[in-house]
């Protein structure tokens, strides 16, 4: 739900900036491809992060944000590169702009490129503010208790 909200807000900001070389469904002027791509992409990164989050549960917020960004940025670059170079999905509305040097992807104005890299951290901060809990924390805690019990019996 949070990822969908962030995606929808982004689409309000960049609404006219999406016009692809493929005919994706558009409703009320909103291209559904980037709307769903952002929501699904943010959700996937969040699921990966939440799986490992119990390992650094007691770490400072800035450490957790750094871990999230370390996941989000490479995934963003990978997906954008594959979409552009392999699937040839091109945004005609921003095709005149130079892509990022290291991947020749995200052909858009600089403010859009920066926004792409900031959307993930903003999403993470929103999730942190509303205190979104990992469904994996309880499972991790149970596994850790089981392992600790097993090893404590060996030491006796």
Predicted regions and their residues:
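Aromatic-rich, lipid-facing transmembrane alpha helices and their immediate juxtamembrane interface loops
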Residues: 1-156
């Amino acid at each position: 739900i949070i990822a969908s909200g962030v995606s929808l807000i982004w689409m309000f900001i960049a609404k006219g900036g999406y016009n692809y070389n493929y005919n994706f469904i558009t409703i009320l002027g909103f291209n559904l491809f980037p709307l769903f791509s952002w929501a699904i992409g943010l959700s996937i990164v969040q699921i990966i992060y939440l799986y490992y989050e119990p390992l650094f549960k007691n770490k400072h917020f800035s450490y957790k944000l750094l871990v999230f960004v370390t996941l989000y940025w490479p995934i963003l670059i990978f997906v954008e590169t594959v979409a552009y170079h392999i699937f040839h999905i091109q945004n005609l509305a921003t095709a005149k702009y130079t892509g990022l040097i290291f991947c020749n992807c995200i052909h858009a104005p600089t403010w859009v490129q920066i926004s792409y890299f900031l959307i993930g951290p903003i999403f993470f901060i929103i999730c942190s503010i509303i205190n979104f809990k990992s469904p994996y924390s309880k499972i991790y805690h149970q596994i850790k208790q089981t392992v600790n019990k097993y090893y404590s019996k060996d030491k006796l």
